[in-house]
Amino acid sequence: MTYRTGTADLKREMERLIRSERHVTSARIARAFGEDGGGAVTCAENLVVAPGLSEEASEALIALVSEGRVFWSPISRTAYHLDGIFLDLPVSYVQRPFDSPTWLPAAFNPPRVHRRVMEAIQLMGGVGLDPEAPDPDRGSHLYGVHTEFECGRCGRCCTLSSPISLEPQDVERISALLEIGIRKTIRKYAALVEVGDHRAWSVKRDSPCTFFDQDRSLCKIHAARPIVCRAFPLLSPRTAGGEPPASWCPSARDL
């Protein structure tokens, strides 16, 4: 069955379907709400939000994800309704426990996906675009700089960084790697961080990070580490506030 409704109704019907089924694949969403074989919208983490969806269906899905109404898994390309776990939480990354949240720069991606990422951010109403950095190519530049970074495994970032922000995609990846449920992952490893009127999930505040293996100086979940860790040292709870990373990260001195 294909739904033929207005924009607001399309969004409402899509959420109703996902809630009733608990999880719905992108292929089924496309069949139900509009297909486009050449369509592909990406989010700001170089992850395909939904291949094969029409523009209208993509807009509705991105809106639901950005509002926290549904949880999108980039691994299984499936939309989940998680009983409001992520409702009312900002999509921006809270990267320091003071002042206002620092947003993830737009398009921290290689150039080949930059254009599609910017289109997705426009559809999301600017979510992920740092209001103090209007240059839309900043993220692409950061990606180029970041490719030159070589970690020295000193462990300082895992010891000094707090809070370590978690987005729904981060939680899903960690859950998949540890082979435990979403709710158990949140209950065991996540905590809410409040900055003024903003709330977001973060790794529970431990020093060093609970996932840091001190004996080997390695991250226990490196393959599924949060985006703020993936983008380190260009993004971190400390560098986001303006502190030069070279002052505490030896490997960042040549960046």
Can you say where each PLM-predicted feature lies in the sequence?
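Short loop/turn segments that flank or connect secondary-structure elements
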Residues: 117-255
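Eukaryotic, polar/proline-rich low-complexity intrinsically disordered regions
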Residues: 34, 56, 75-76, 83
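A short acidic, leucine-rich amphipathic alpha-helix
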Residues: 28-30, 64
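Positively charged, polyanion-binding regions of nucleic-acid-associated proteins
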Residues: 3-27
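Short amphipathic alpha-helical interaction segments
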Residues: 49-66, 72
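Alpha-helix C-caps/helix-loop-beta hinges
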Residues: 21, 67-68
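Short, amphipathic alpha-helical interaction segments positioned at domain boundaries
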Residues: 79-120
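Short, positively charged loop/turn segments that connect secondary-structure elements
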Residues: 34-56
